[in-house]
Amino acid sequence: PTYNEDLNVVKNTIYASLGIDWPKDKLNIWILDDGGREEFRQFAQNVGVKYIARTTHEHAKAGNINNALKYAKGEFVSIFDCDHVPTRSFLQMTMGWFLKEKQLAMMQTPHHFFSPDPFERNLGRFRKTPNEGTLFYGLVQDGNDMWDATFFCGSCAVIRRKPLDEIGGIAVETVTEDAHTSLRLHRRGYTSAYMRIPQAAGLATESLSAHIGQRIRWARGMVQIFRLDNPLTGKGLKFAQRLCYVNAMFHFLSGIPRLIFLTAPLAFLLLHAYIIYAPALMIALFVLPHMIHASLTNSKIQGKYRHSFWSEIYETVLAWYIAPPTLVALINPHKGKFNVTAKGGLVEEEYVDWVISRPYIFLVLLNLVG
């Protein structure tokens, strides 16, 4: 699927898809162009792949894929974001599991990135510390897999067509159509699997604003699912599966308490308001051991997937921006729209994003005043 990405971004994915090690008579490649661009249609014709453009654009990416499913007749569907370049071995590594397990509806592989995200670029940590998404595509998805609760992540996955048709195609009710789709598959009694071997590589978000915009969509979408199709209720899920889904949803609500902790000292410094009625020594005796224990425990469990110090940076930067939309989604899950993540951009020179930086500058100034 593609919407507004440059043709050069899509070309790499198509060329790599043509080179996948699989019988050519069983491999059908489609460009799903929601932008309806003539250059894309011409390119598809030149390289021998199929092309679909919609006349209407409802339900964004999910609607684009569902429209293509009307024409694609294969028993299995593999989906790649337009910037995710698959390896030659992708189908060889994933398809065998479907033959072994007839109830397997979806096989997910990691999202691996060959370019630095804004944190890695700005802090000079590319390939030196774990990527922000490494924790999810490492420990979290491995744990989900153990409890048969692997999430569909929208790309780099294979889905069996029959179960997908049974649930009406890709879910369109929320902006995280991928996780919602896997939830529906699990409710129908189908299984899923995760293979922690990268079989595709894509482009990380180039700018901090694009990165934050993507996380806002994920956060809002997971809270929408919690409100509209709560995994704690309804039929079809095992207890462990319910916990796995709720854990992912509650993670995105962490922005609210983090903002409270960031601003609580200022309430005392500026307004002399006591958040906790206790002497400073008693607070330190209770809080510091907990903080040290939590940090050491997380470091022990997460190991090479997420470092505690960098985790605080990731979560603090995002907290300002995911707290409002998640709160709104809790109150009104139908509010908001799907935001496309920009791909294929190139940051040619360093600059300060004053708009994104505004909350942090404001907090620093308040602390100085305090």
Language-model features: locations:
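Membrane-proximal cytosolic interface modules of multi-pass membrane proteins
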Residues: 1-15
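Short, acidic, metal-binding catalytic loop of nucleotide-sugar glycosyltransferases
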Residues: 14-26
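Long helical/loop segments within the catalytic core of UDP-sugar-dependent glycosyltransferases
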Residues: 52-76, 88-175, 186-187, 204, ...
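Membrane-embedded multi-pass helical conduit in multi-pass membrane proteins
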Residues: 251-336, 352-370
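A conserved hydrophobic helix/loop-capping motif in glycosyltransferases and polysaccharide synthases
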Residues: 1-5, 20, 97
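A conserved acidic beta->alpha catalytic loop
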Residues: 33-40, 56-57
